[in-house]
Amino acid sequence: MQIKENKQLCLISLGCSKNLVDSEVMLGKLYNYTLTNDTKSADVILINTCGFIESAKQESIQTILNAAKDKKKGAILIASGCLSERYKDEIKELIPEVDIFTGVGDYDKIDIMIAKKQNQFSEQVFLSEHYNARIITGSSVHAYVKISEGCNQKCSFCAIPSFKGKLQSRELDSILKEAENLALKGYTDMTFIAQDSSSFLYDKGQKDGLIQLISAIDKQQALKSARILYLYPSSTTLELISTIESSPIFQNYFDMPIQHISDSMLKKMRRNSSQAHHLKLLDAMKQVKESFIRSTIIVGHPEENEGEFEELSAFLDEFRFDRLNIFAFSAEENTHAYSLEKVPKKIINARIKALNKIALKHQNNSFKALLNKPIKALVENKEGEYFYKARDLRWAPEVDGEILINDSELATPLKPGHYTIMPSAFKDNILLAKVLSPF
C-alpha cells in the first residue's frame, strides 16, 4: 500500500510535450506527495523549465520568480529542465531564490535531490524507459510516449543540440513494453514524440526506425489510435508516409516543421533539405485520404529578404496547411545564426501579421470542412458543467483544436474513450458536436 506523505507538491511543467513526459516521470518518483496547484500552500514547488527560445526562457524565469514570492517558509523551490541545463554555470547566481537546480539528466532522481537538498547535473541526458514509473496527467485515455532524445541536425537557429545532445533512440522493445503497459491502464490513444521523430534509430544505424515502430505497434494491437509529432524533412520518406497511410492505428496526421520553402533560405537555415524535397513530401501527404497536415514557419531569420518572404507567403496560401505555427526568429547563443545581421523587428512583425492572416483563413476552412460529417474522435473529460471535451483522432492534444459535446443531448453520461461524432457548428476555434456511437 502506498502511504501519502502529509506534504503537498506543486508541479508546473512548461514548454513542450517532451518536457511533460519528464515531468510525469518526476511525479512517479514523488507519488507520496499530495498534488496541489497552489504555490502558497505547497511544501515543494517543482518547475520544469523550457529554454528553447527567448519567450520560453522569459516565461520560465518569471514563473520561478512568482513561485519564489509565493512560497511559504520552509518550502523547497526546484528548477529543473532545459533552462537550468542550458545556463547551469550561471543560473545559480542569477536566480538565488531557487533551492535546488537540476538539468535534463536526473528526472528519475528528483526524490533523492529533495531528500538531500542538493543540486544535480548529470552529463547523460535522461531518456524515459518502460520501467520508469509515470503519473499520466490531463487524460485517462491519452498518453505521450517519447521515442528518443537529442538531435543530430545542425539547423542555424536551433540551440537544442547544445543542451540536449546528440540523437539517443530508445530500444524498440522498450517502447512496445511501455505502450502495452499504458494500454492495460486504459491509455489506448498515444502520441509518439521526439525532437526529430523521423530519425528514430538513425543513431543505431537503421534508416527505417520509425517504419519499424509503426509496424510493431500495428502488430501489437494494444492501441486504438496514435499519431506522430515532429517529422524532420530530410529524414522523412515517401515510404514512411505510405506506412502511416496504411496503418490501422496511426492516424493520417503529418506534423512536419518546414520552417521555410525558399531554397536560398533553407540553405541559410542549414536545413539539409530543398524546396523540391519539401514539395514532394507535402504533395504525398496531401494525397493521403483525409490527411491532416501541420507545420511550423520561422519568420525573419537573418538575411531573409523580401523576395524570399513573398515566395513563402505565396506557397502557404496555395498549399493550405490545416494548422500552422508561425514564430519570429529568436537569436540564440551557441547557434550559427546568432551573430548574423538581423532583420529589423518592425519588418518581422509585419511579415508575421501577413502570414497569420493566411494561416487563420485556412485553419478556419479546415475546421468548417468537418461540419455535418461523421468523424472519429476521442472524448477525454468533462469541460465545465455542461460539456464534454473531445478532439478529432487526427489532432494532437491541446494544439489542434477542441470539440465540445453538450451533455444535455445525452441519454447517459459519456465515459472517456473513442466515439464517432458529428460536428454541427463552429465558432472561435471550437466545434460543437453530438455523439453518434462508440467504436
From Swiss-Prot:
The entry marks the following residues as binding [4Fe-4S] cluster 2, namely C151, C155, C158
Keyword Ribonucleoprotein listed? The answer is no
Cited Gene3D superfamilies: Methylthiotransferase, N-terminal domain, tm_1862 like domain
Cofactor stoichiometry and binding? Binds 2 [4Fe-4S] clusters. One cluster is coordinated with 3 cysteines and an exchangeable S-adenosyl-L-methionine.
Q: Where does the record place it?
A: Cytoplasm
Q: Which Pfam families match?
A: Radical_SAM (PF04055), UPF0004 (PF00919)
List the CDD domains hit by this protein, alphabetically. Radical_SAM
Binding residues annotated for [4Fe-4S] cluster 1, in chain numbering: C16, C50, C82
Q: Where is the MTTase N-terminal domain?
A: 7-119
Q: Kindly provide the name given to this protein in its UniProt entry.
A: Ribosomal protein uS12 methylthiotransferase RimO
UniProt source species: Helicobacter pylori (strain Shi470)
Gene from which this protein is expressed: rimO
